[in-house]
Regions:
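N-terminal active-site segment of His-dependent metallophosphoesterases
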Residues: 40-98, 247
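N-terminal secretory signal peptides that target proteins for export/translocation
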Residues: 1-15
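His/acidic metal-ligating clusters that form di-metal
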Residues: 72-79, 108, 191, 207-312
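Active-site neighborhood of phospho(di)ester-bond hydrolases with catalytic His/Asp-centered motifs
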Residues: 51-53, 80-85, 114-119, 253-254, ...
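A short C-terminal boundary segment appended to hydrolase-like catalytic domains
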Residues: 345-374
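Active-site environment of divalent metal-dependent phosphoester hydrolases
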Residues: 58-59, 88-90, 118-127, 199-203, ...
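Bacterial N-terminal signal peptides
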Residues: 20-31
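Extended active-site neighborhood of metal-dependent phosphoesterases/phosphodiesterases
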Residues: 97-226, 313-348
Length: 374
């Protein structure tokens, strides 16, 4: 996301140190055995993963992101979930050379496996003049060939440069959309659809939105509708797997903030989200969360400030606006740092605890902004 809703001061106020560590209660406590997608399933036990997104952005991000990577590599996490946007939407060019450079200069620097969902800045927004004026679909093809699947059909793994995690994480990919991934690991099912910001690449008619995004170039309903249907099918399949495996919880990774709040847009600086473009994915998440009954965690980036909330409300199985209907207590959303706020979140997962998810914020000392006293 590149049209920020909040000022820097407002964003900093949103981060309250009192909430740096918090737990979200599970709806059901039991003992579960992980059903990994490889032949050798491992018993589930407490472990940690890193949650990051929206980096490296611009010169500041290029300088600060290595500090984040170094902290993650020095930690005891098992893997990293990256919620997209490897470049800024306001100036980083979508050149052919940019993508392999990100592979070697960013993704390959992580010691443990990294799982990545595609952001809008990598392809949807590449038609903007400031990003080079490229055809978005040509950039999407480069994202796929550099980060997900080679021309010979071989799937690409990210991170794991030290080979320190067993290869038993058997990752499933959709045949038509290689970026759609799914796997089971230590009692948790991970589902990765492809849901970027900038209205999910749908054709948006709002004049202010189109002005912000270089007029009529924006959006492709043919691409959007096909991928949207694939996303819904993938989410359904992932939850079916979670139920069959007896998973203690489900984690879903997307890039876009899918506008759970439903508030009005600022016409002077229109936001990248469009509620209608995410409706089918959100409904699929609701339907499956209600059926699954156990804890579900949605991770997204896009906004660049850290936040944990329970944004899902429903009436008769349909989504309703926040604070209306009934709160879906087994659905939690975590939004990661990013852009000018280059820090990371540790998710501690304990399949045997009534508190399945515990969030621990890691503020990278070298990346702190200097604030003058008033």
């Amino acid at each position: 996301m590149n049209a920020a809703r909040m000022t820097t001061t407002q964003k900093l106020k949103r981060f309250n140190p009192l909430f740096a560590i918090l737990t979200i209660g599970a709806m059901t406590a039991a003992l579960f055995i992980a059903a990994d997608s490889s032949a050798n399933a491992a018993q589930s036990y407490k472990y940690s993963i890193a949650l990051i997104g929206d980096m490296p952005y611009d010169a500041k991000g290029v300088t600060q992101t290595p500090n984040v990577i170094n902290e993650i590599n020095a930690s005891r996490i098992d893997l990293t979930l990256f919620d997209g946007d490897t470049m800024s939407g306001k100036g980083d060019k979508c050149t052919d050379a940019a993508y392999p450079a990100l592979k070697t200069g960013f993704f390959d620097k992580f010691f443990k496996p990294l799982f990545y969902t595609i952001g809008d800045n990598e392809w949807v927004d590449c038609d903007r003049a400031v990003k080079g004026g490229f055809d978005p679909l040509s950039r999407l093809a480069l994202v796929r060939s550099n980060f997900f699947q080679k021309a010979d059909g071989t799937y690409i793994t990210l991170g794991n440069s030290m080979g320190t995690t067993p290869s038993r994480i058997g990752v499933m990919h959709d045949s038509a959309y290689p970026e759609l991934q799914m796997f089971s690991y230590k009692g948790i099912t991970y589902i990765i659809p492809h849901v970027p910001g900038s209205a999910n690449n749908s054709a948006v008619a709002t004049p202010t939105f189109k002005t912000y995004n270089d007029a009529a170039k924006d959006g492709d309903d043919v691409e959007y509708k096909a991928r949207d249907a694939a996303n819904v099918a993938w989410i359904n399949k992932g939850f079916e797997k979670a139920i069959a495996d007896g998973s203690a919880g489900v984690i879903v990774l997307v890039q876009a903030n899918m506008d759970w709040e439903g508030y009005a847009r600022d016409a002077a600086a229109p936001n990248n989200e469009n509620t209608a473009a995410f409706a089918n994915v959100k409904q699929a998440l609701l339907t499956n969360t209600l059926k699954f009954k156990k804890p579900v965690l949605l991770q997204n980036g896009d906004e660049h400030w850290y936040q944990v909330d329970m944004p899902m409300n429903e009436t008769a199985g349909k989504l309703v606006e926040k604070d209306k209907g009934s709160l879906v207590e087994n659905f939690t959303r975590v939004q990661t740092f990013g852009s000018g706020f280059n820090h990371w979140v540790e998710l501690i997962i304990d399949p045997h605890s009534t508190n399945l998810w515990t969030f621990k914020v890691h503020i990278v000392k070298e990346n702190l902004d200097v604030h003058a006293a008033s």
